[in-house]
Amino acid sequence: MTAWILLPVSLSAFSITGIWTVYAMAVMNRHVCPVENWSYNDSCSPDPAEQGGPKTCCTLDDVPLISKCGTYPPESCLFSLIGNMGAFMVALICLLRYGQLLEQNRHSWINTTALITGCTNAAGLVVVGNFQVDHAKSLHYIGAGVAFPAGLLFVCLHCVLFYHGATTPLDMAMAYLRSVLAVIAFVTLVLSGVFFLHESSELQHGAALCEWVFVLDILIFYGTFSYEFGAVSSDTLVAALQPAPGRACKSSGSSSTSTHLNCAPESIAMI
């Protein structure tokens, strides 16, 4: 077991704690309304008597979407930090898992596609975290439109990869757990998108709740990689970064692909 096992857990713990902290700050600073609030008005007149605590009069501008919670300072600063650090950890996890599967001689387009979608998810998170929705709406929506579907596709691809590699009852239990998380992610992302397109306050609030469930679900999924990361080593990172031609060497009389860095001895022997 290596220290790499802490990376997926750290991503989940850091990001989940961070976004809930951002939400709490946004509520206390009266930048959004609490998630338990379902009552929205067309407009609200400022009440000087109200100081501190959550808003009691809410409009559609106060719907507690995750992005909305991180729009204004000081919570926007923490939101950007979470987005940047979370994106780095996501990319590192994707790269290590990709290399781990290569070490197991599991060379497939699914593994490569999963790496691409995971890194795309990370890139989208950087854009979402650094371009707040009220200040750079187009860029923020582009980032979200890239990050969320890419994250969902990454989850689905790794469900397939893990299921086909499961060999023990514990592996199968983890495969079923990840499948459930993938289904929840798919349903909540679709519902969030559908609800968000409507101007109804109830549907907008429903979109916010679905978005929260989707993000938390994806973060929990990333945390489950600690199951495999006990076997990760520095060689795993080398395997992930190794150029494709070096991996594509086949041993004599076999169709299996070798993951060794140097195939020259084999070539000389064949000569």
Swiss-Prot record:
Statement: the UniProt record of this protein carries the keyword Transmembrane helix: yes
Glycosylation site residues: 37, 41
Transmembrane intervals: 3-23, 76-96, 109-129, 142-162, 179-199, 212-232
GO cellular component terms, A-Z: plasma membrane
Keyword Transmembrane found: yes
Induction remark: Up-regulated in the liver by fasting.
Membrane topology classification: Multi-pass membrane protein
InterPro entries: DRAM/TMEM150_Autophagy_Mod, Frag1/DRAM/Sfk1
Membrane topology (Extracellular): 24-75, 130-141, 200-211
Cellular compartment(s): Cell membrane
SUBUNIT field: Interacts (via C-terminal cytoplasmic tail) with PI4KA.
Family designation: Belongs to the DRAM/TMEM150 family.
Official protein name in the record: Transmembrane protein 150A
Species assigned in the record: Rattus norvegicus
